[in-house]
Amino acid sequence: MAPLKLNSRNLAQIFAAGKDRVKVPTYQRGSAVKEGIVHVGVGGFHRAHLAVYVDQLMQNHGVNDYAICGVGLQPFDAAMRDALRSQDHLYTVIERSAKGSFAHVVGSINSYLFAPDNREAVIAKMAHPDTHIVSLTITESGYYYNENTHELQAEHPDIQFDLDPANEKTPRTTFGFLYAALARRHQQGLRPFTVLSCDNMQKNGSITRHMLESFARLRNPELAKWIAEQGAFPNAMVDRITPQTSPTDKKALAETIGIEDSWPVVTEPFMQWVLEDQFSDGRPPFEKAGAQVVKNVHDVEQFEKHKLRLLNGSHSAIGYAGQMAGFEYVHEVMEHPLYNRFVWQMMQEEVKPLLPEIPGVDIDEYCKTLMERFSNPTIMDQLPRICLNASGKIPQFIMPSIAEAIWVTGPFRRLCFVAAAWFRYLNGIDDSGKTFNVDDPMREELQAKARAGGTNPAELLNVKSLFGDDLRSDKRFLQEITTAMEAIARDGIMKTMPKYVD
């Protein structure tokens, strides 16, 4: 039997054909529901995470006023627009584990707006009374956050464009859209919507608040005061490994489940969301779908710290050292005994001692679970995805652990090796001489500095938007990272790593 094209009309047939291997939405969609959430940045992670939580609320708990309107701000978002619109905004989540695969058709995304087509439509949608939450997955670079000063990059050309009152109806950045929509709600006497960051950053809500309030103060101090007093920006820890979808994934879905999907999502069974209960205009009962909703922002920060330092820090170790050694997938790296031991020892000996205890959380078990997740061969998680946008990741995932280890005189050799591997990676040439693309918003600047610096870290450490003054002046750190850089340049990753494994 030929695969069925995914759309509303074919859902019943898809369910019948898939039997116990596929789940489909049976709730109402379209004009029968209200779109209470506008989500900016509809990629794989959003569709495997927040959209799945909302789908469960709509399917199992009758929530019909928090369907999602997706928004794409960038020209490349046209591909997602076309894929979703061609199948009534439905898509398939494929969960893969050692036990097999399970398909789940998700219907919580009810519509999609492509800003380059109609920027006014996006502003109007955010400003609409039915909109209670504007959620974000815009990656670290989308926040225009200076890691060194912790301030808005107000001098950035796109921010400067959006700060010009003449451009209020044609913004470029997320903050330009948020500002325009909130200004309109303020004029209409509505409450501000909650701005909910779902990006993988520590204190993501606090950073979002500070960036938006800073932007608003430069435009209209009165509106900035209203946002500060009445707005809400929950902090959240998000977790679900979601690799890029490949043509092989689409083919397998068609052949094994019988679904023809333009852009399915492949992910793992594990999913976690720890969310601060701070909302300005209502929220759905996320906890009924499995989210951990907490009252104290400190609780979120503790979970965030565990996840960013252990999971994402280890991902960085796997990604940059793995790419330099010619590996292609995360599980391949973890199958190599040397890398496997390196990751485990870095977590246990250098990162874990720096982390706070969380009641009910066994850090050793968490680390073991991470090793199992990294080793899952069925999701085929590509190293280029892990390496993407490192300038927004390394300062969060690796450097804070190094700084804290120095402060408490703890070990940090392996963490320095990871930073050195990234510095070497920035050259765009692996240890066999093969070139690869360094996909980073700061690529030109960082690549030039990496090549100019060679085995001297000073050129890169002088990028003040990424690295603070303390590390640049610490002799222990400079000695460790220089030693690692020299060894990697001379001997390559594979011959250097044994020096960092007990």
Swiss-Prot record:
An example molecular function term from Gene Ontology annotations: mannitol 2-dehydrogenase activity
Domain of life, source organism: Eukaryota
Pfam family, one: Mannitol_dh
Entry-linked InterPro entries: 6-PGluconate_DH-like_C_sf (IPR008927), 6PGD_dom2 (IPR013328), Mannitol_DH (IPR000669), Mannitol_DH/Oxidoreductase (IPR050988), Mannitol_DH_C (IPR013118), Mannitol_DH_N (IPR013131), NAD(P)-bd_dom_sf (IPR036291)
Residues given in the record as NAD(+) binding sites: I37, V38, H39, V40, G41, V42, G43, G44, F45, H46, R47, A48
Keywords, comma-separated and alphabetical: NAD, Oxidoreductase
EC id: 1.1.1.67
Class of the enzyme per the UniProt entry, highest EC level: oxidoreductase
Record flagged with keyword Oxidoreductase: yes
Catalytic activity: D-mannitol + NAD(+) = D-fructose + NADH + H(+)
SUPFAM superfamilies recorded: 6-phosphogluconate dehydrogenase C-terminal domain-like, NAD(P)-binding Rossmann-fold domains
Transmembrane feature ranges: none
Nucleotidyltransferase as UniProt keyword: no
Function: Catalyzes the NAD(H)-dependent interconversion of D-fructose and D-mannitol in the mannitol metabolic pathway.
Family: Belongs to the mannitol dehydrogenase family.
Subunit structure: Monomer.
Protein's name according to its UniProt entry: Mannitol 2-dehydrogenase
Species of the source: Aspergillus terreus (strain NIH 2624 / FGSC A1156)
